[in-house]
Amino acid sequence: MKSLIIGDCHGEAPDIPEEGFDLILCAGDICGGTDEMRNKMFEAMDTEKEWYELFGEEEAKEAVKSSIQEGKEIFDELDSLGVPVFIVPGNWGWTGENSDWEFLEGRGYPEMLEEFDNLHDLNFDCIEEKGWNFIGYGPCSGPEIPQYEDDKPESEEEMDDIQRDYEDKKQRLQKLFTCEKTVFLSHNVPHDTSLDKIDNEDSPVHGRHYGSVIVREMIEEFSPEYSVAGHMHEGKGRETLGDTECLNTGLNSVW
């Protein structure tokens, strides 16, 4: 079985061959986004406002519509290839997770996949294809449990909520790892590897690791044959953890 692997397109269509593979794996962040949107999202982390309030709600709605449309155009190209496409959402999938913005309801992921016959949502699911089991885990922009003191919330209540969410996600995934010959498709890479290290010397978190704790724990507990992920654009490449070959697809890459 030959797989085509796509990572973090961010609205830019990748250079996809027309044949030579049996299925496609997509690690999320297919939809686009502007620098201004990203800046407001980072800015909102230090305020009590949502990013779209800082951006201007009507302008934000138009920006999200444009982002989703860019994603759908790429999905349409993938769908036209006539092979199964397994996808997990990234943090640019407009899932509405961790957001009360009613505008997103029914617009983003996974609803945006419904018009395509060959696209399959793998988030917290297991699908068997050609003798292999594909397990998916979607949005995750950093360690599910904060690993650095300045990332930890101020209140015990917030930390308790984080812990409960982490335990819930971990247990949901553990129930899926029941078979051999497994490919684990996640948005974020395993924590504390060469694949998740912040190498940008201008970054305030230079040298830190912001991969997924849960992805690492699933690899250590179940040893899937392959771990495929993206999100961390800097860490493009491969690393082996135990018996698992791990791949960081990098930015707008095809493997």
Cite the ranges covered by each PLM segment:
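Divalent metal-coordination and catalytic microenvironments
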Residues: D8, I24, D29, G90, ...
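Extreme N-terminal starter segment of soluble prokaryotic enzymes
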Residues: M1-L4
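Conserved beta-sheet core of the metallophosphoesterase superfamily
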Residues: P84-V88, S194-W255
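Conserved catalytic scaffold of divalent metal-dependent phosphoesterases
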Residues: C9-G11, I30-D35, G93-R208, G250
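Core catalytic region of metal-dependent phosphoesterases/phosphodiesterases
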Residues: G11-E129, G250-L251
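Short, conserved loop/helix-junction motifs that constitute active-site signature segments
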Residues: E18, D76-G82, L176-T178, I219-F222, ...
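Well-ordered alpha-helical segments embedded in enzymatic catalytic cores
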Residues: E73, D168-K169, I214
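Active-site-proximal segments of metal-dependent phosphoesterases and phosphodiesterases across multiple
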Residues: A44-V64, I68, E180-S223
